[in-house]
Amino acid sequence: MAKEKVVLAYSGGLDTSVAVKWLTDKGYDVIAVGLDVGEGKDLEFVKQKALQVGAIQSYTIDAKKEYAESFVLPALQAHALYEQKYPLVSALSRPLISKKLVEIAEQTGATAVAHGCTGKGNDQVRFEVSIQALNPNLKVLAPVREWAWSRDEEIEYAKAHNIPIPIDLDNPYSVDQNLWGRSNECGVLEDPWATPPEGAYALTAPLEKTPDTPDIIELSFEKGVPVAINGEAYPLDQLILTLNEIAGKHGVGRIDHVENRLVGIKSREVYECPGAMTLIKAHKELEDLTLPKELAHFKPVIEKKLTELIYEGLWFSSLQPALLAFLKESQTHVTGVVRVKLFKGHAIIEGRKSAYSLYNEKLATYTPDDEFDHSAAVGFISLWGLPTKVHSMVTKEKKEVTL
């Protein structure tokens, strides 16, 4: 009788390598899937390691382009910052990984999908809800959550079964990285009073070692999509990776955040998001120039809802297409160039321009070139303040009766 197949989200690390053997011992044929969403992973190494530790098949997918265009871009256009700080680095990649796992499960006839999340984090929710939304007939397995071993027990299991142990296993931090940034937790970072050691950072320079001369760059957008740096066009994924390097060397994008996790606990996280934070700031400035007041004031309602939806693992909910449709419509005229100075940990906006600019200098100026009709203000103020005036007249004439 043929074994059931399970598709495992495989990173090449200790947890998922042990999971291959553990799932095999449970009677499954394991199909490993490794994705590159911009962390610089050696896909061929990941593929071969999965086979080495017992997978019957191993798939590797370069998903940077799809990740940037279909997941990161809406988050950028929504200025998605969970609790006004976290640009959803890990949360954004989970629905894409889930999508690829389900696609390969359906292609190979697998009956289950597995992930390497613990029972304490948000990612288990994001993966399982996404997978259920995409194919409710698939079983979802969580071996790391089920076995609940300590790190030492896991290492002993790996040694006993000749599973290669990663050379960076003594790294005290739990790290997740993709092109939108890098997240870091555990170790000394679990103490919210502790200063994050420099060893916790990889994408950004400490302020003491940043250049004493700023980089001044121009970011070009077309309908809300970043398309060029200093006039040089890039595909979106490569533009973000390039900006990570430029802004990162100036120490831009370090975030230290005690956040409210979906599972009900608070967690101290350290993030590095040089490209993300620079792009979000520049995009917002271009919107300030091009969006009419009503749209600009309403859009944050949609932004907050999409941010929560992503963080809470509901990317594939029925609400998401409606939110993205609003975002797409809102970006029709968000075309132009923003000039940014990168210096000593800051991305400073120095200028913005657009053919769709709603800023009229002749109306805004206080010079003799002023074309604003000052006399119109009298009638406007009278009508604008009329409800307030009437209310005041009534309340002053009649005192409220308290029953």
Swiss-Prot record:
Q: What is its EC number?
A: 6.3.4.5
Q: Which GO terms describe its biological process?
A: argininosuccinate metabolic process; L-arginine biosynthetic process; urea cycle
Q: What is the annotated quaternary arrangement, including any partners?
A: Homotetramer.
- MF terms in GO: argininosuccinate synthase activity; ATP binding
Q: What is its main location?
A: cytoplasm
Name of the protein this chain belongs to: Argininosuccinate synthase
Q: Which UniProt keywords apply?
A: Amino-acid biosynthesis, Arginine biosynthesis, ATP-binding, Cytoplasm, Ligase, Nucleotide-binding
* GO cellular component terms given for this protein: cytoplasm
The beginning of the lineage is: Bacteria, Bacillati, Bacillota, Bacilli, Bacillales
Residues bound to L-aspartate: T118, N122, D123
Q: Which residues bind ATP?
A: A9, Y10, S11, G12, G13, L14, D15, T16, S17, G116
